[in-house]
Amino acid sequence: MSTRRTTLALCATATLMLGSACHSNTPPVIVAPPPLSDSAAAALRWVNAHAVPFTIPDSMHPVTDRMPIMDFVGNARVLGVSELTEGTHQFAGIMQSILATLSSRGFRGLAIQAPMAETMEIDRYVRTGTGDPKRWLRALGLHWNTQEIFTLVQWVREYDRSRGPAEQIGFYGFEIPNAAHALQVITTLPDSVAGAGFNAFVRRQIQCVTTGESAAWGREGPASDSTFWNRCRAATASVVDSLGALQSRLAGRSSAQAMVAFAQQMARVAQHDADVGLRRLPRHETVAEHILWLASLAGSDGNLLVWGRDVESGRLTGEGNVVQSAVPVAKTLGDRYRNLAFTVGEGVVRAQPINVGQREPGGETDMRLRPPRVGSYEDMLDRASGEALFIDMRTLGTDTASTWLKGPRSARLVSGIYSENPIGSFETPLQFPTYYDGLLFVKHGTPATPLRR
């Protein structure tokens, strides 16, 4: 709890104690929300008739309870979910439940919006038990360093423990700010495993990735030369092949083979980085290429669940003409891309506070959400029946309720920072099913818990 909120709580407690000496206890005054417009009331009736309630996993409700989304997902190759309201306890459990449900439908990977190479360390852990997942969740940043994400990682580990590689669920990151960690893994194999000569060869071949990443794009030099990148693609491919051959030569040395296999996986990341770098794509197309590449790791029949922060998984262009990666992903996959938005009606989230006069947000704390804006999706959904709802928006028609639900209409957008004071909108306009095929709504959010060391 923040100092400001603690002070307010103490003042409120003192006031109540003084008041109780002179007056009898009176029930708190609950201010009813403004009545819905006729069209919003029609939308509420539609939601109550069509929404499907679901159970969020917790100690009382195991993850074996299935999410009601199989028909919605259909033959989708990629399911993207936008975490519009970040910092809740509930969302990681919902993603865990979705993954458990869709594992029987060939979903073989979860990709989060985090650095790819570092997240590969968590992938190695869930598949083999090697490594320290808490260390790597810390490395991914505050958003991922929570008890809820750790619980999700442990669930994937237990799922994978008794399954072969083809049936396991992978844990990936779909951003590559740089390939530094991948290169470190590739170039630090012990000489006792790879040999000094082999390691020297690998370091020479892979150096081009570092050169390309450190160069200034659009200026004179190798990074502006397609010939350089073509050579780099060939060099990284030779490293991948050489590590595969080394792994074969290490037959009978299981620990050494596992070490080399992981280095080969990191070499594939570097190879993919070089391949995408050659094409000099804008950010949204680059990220889309990462997502589609991760989907390919699951095989021709494998599918991928994508956890996008804020509106990343939406088919939309935001402020400043910022195009989201889901736009090119959907263009490539067509109806084999499905997506959902997640939002919360009220409650408390974990976020970094920002207030008037602050140039930078403060450290993370628990923050109470402001009441929903009148006319917003949350304002209407807060009055729906049920605590947690899944709504398939693809069935909207042309009646009054459907017109209201289609939008554009505002929804919460809490992306790492927030203010309990009335500054900033912390909202984004949505349209259904143009931006999202469906919606996941939780009426009362509670804050995520920082991961204990």
Label the model's feature ranges.
Residues 22-453:
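Structured catalytic-domain cores with a bias toward divalent-metal coordination
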Residues 2-3, 18, 25:
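Short intrinsically disordered, low-complexity coil segments enriched in acidic
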Residues 1-11:
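Bacterial N-terminal signal peptides that target proteins for export
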